[in-house]
């Protein structure tokens, strides 16, 4: 009897100390936000954008100098992906056309005969013009976009600005630094911001994928979870090999994979009362894909013939709602946003309101 009382007493003391710490942190106006999502969800872009808006200090020249070689590398890789695709699909009168504009046809002819050494490749101004022209051809864009955007979320930002970035005197501006992030980070990174009388700490788990159950408890003290989702990944293959309890064949694509990750993480008992905001990104890209791709062909659970974007948004939203194991706690909030639109990132008052309603 005494030992049982001792165990219960220790448990009560632990829970009490946790509650005291949480109240202390909130009284000090410290709000800790856990950010989750894959490398193409615009999670890192969001954090950098928020930091650039709310921090009084401008991005330093040292940041521009340090990221310059990476941007050149990313630009070169995007160029090579476009050229490789063109040269792997030679055109003839018998083949299906892949370009529809005069500038696109000229660029295709130039790039199809372009010779380069992969390990000594430099994006020149002349090459940038042809890459820009062909990637702005509507028909060609429908072919190339899924390929290059699956590799980098900033791929089309690079293409859009390739003429400027190919200049010999190019120096990255603030937007370049924000948008052209270093992908495939696997550590945990904090971004701290003081806004008004409150301090916000964004905790980014990077792209850690292994043994989530072993490390997720380290973030049990977060006040809110931001879960980022790229809507246009419904036709891309999943990244991970599922556990024994989850057959690989049960995961259809990267969109479905991220919904399963959501299920695994936010339904952990550590987060049963933690508000969760799901942020849908790349809505415009999804709409563009749906013009040429049928959603139900890549997502068998979607039992509808409609390829209407609004119907598909509703379906994806419901997938998250159905996977919330604690619906009575009213902790789930779903929104769409554009990571490059600064007007949509002013959400701190909204976060505060959610926290006030849930404390």
UniProtKB/Swiss-Prot annotation:
Residues 337-342 are annotated as: G5 motif. Residues 29-359 form the G-alpha domain. Residues 200-209 are annotated as: G3 motif. The keyword GTP-binding applies. Mg(2+) binds at residue 44. Belongs to the G-alpha family. This is Guanine nucleotide-binding protein-like alpha-11 subunit. It comes from Dictyostelium discoideum (Social amoeba).
């Amino acid at each position: 009897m005494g030992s049982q009382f001792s165990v219960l007493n220790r448990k009560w003391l632990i829970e009490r100390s946790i509650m005291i710490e949480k109240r202390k942190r909130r009284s000090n106006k410290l709000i800790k936000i856990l950010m989750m999502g894959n490398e193409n969800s615009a999670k890192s872009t969001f954090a950098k954008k928020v930091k650039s808006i709310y921090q009084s200090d401008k991005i330093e020249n040292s940041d521009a100098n340090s990221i310059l070689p990476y941007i050149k590398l990313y630009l070169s890789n995007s160029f090579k992906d476009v050229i490789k695709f063109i040269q792997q699909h030679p055109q003839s009168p018998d083949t299906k056309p892949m370009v529809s504009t005069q500038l696109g046809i000229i660029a295709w002819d130039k790039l199809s005969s372009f010779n380069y050494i992969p390990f000594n490749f430099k994006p020149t101004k002349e090459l940038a013009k042809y890459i820009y022209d062909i990637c702005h051809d509507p028909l060609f864009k429908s072919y190339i976009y899924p390929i290059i955007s699956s590799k980098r979320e900033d791929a089309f930002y690079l293409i859009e600005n390739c003429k400027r970035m190919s200049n010999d005197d190019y120096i990255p501006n603030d937007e370049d630094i924000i948008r052209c992030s270093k992908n495939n980070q696997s550590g945990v990174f904090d971004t701290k911001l003081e806004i008004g009388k409150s301090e916000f700490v964004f905790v980014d788990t990077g792209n850690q994928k292994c043994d989530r159950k072993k490390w997720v408890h380290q973030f049990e003290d977060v006040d809110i979870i931001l879960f980022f989702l790229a809507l246009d990944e419904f036709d891309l293959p999943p990244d991970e090999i599922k556990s024994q309890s989850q057959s690989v064949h049960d995961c259809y694509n990267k969109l479905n994979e991220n919904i399963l990750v959501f299920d695994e993480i936010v339904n952990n008992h550590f987060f049963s009362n933690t508000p969760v905001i799901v942020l849908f990104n790349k809505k415009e890209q999804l709409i563009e894909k749906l013009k040429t791709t049928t959603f139900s062909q890549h997502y068998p659970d979607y039992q509808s013939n409609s390829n209407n974007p609004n119907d598909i948004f509703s379906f994806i939203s419901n997938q998250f709602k159905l996977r919330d194991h604690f619906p009575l706690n009213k902790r789930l909030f779903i929104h769409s946003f554009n990571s490059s639109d600064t007007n949509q990132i002013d959400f701190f008052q909204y976060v505060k309101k959610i926290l006030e309603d849930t404390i």
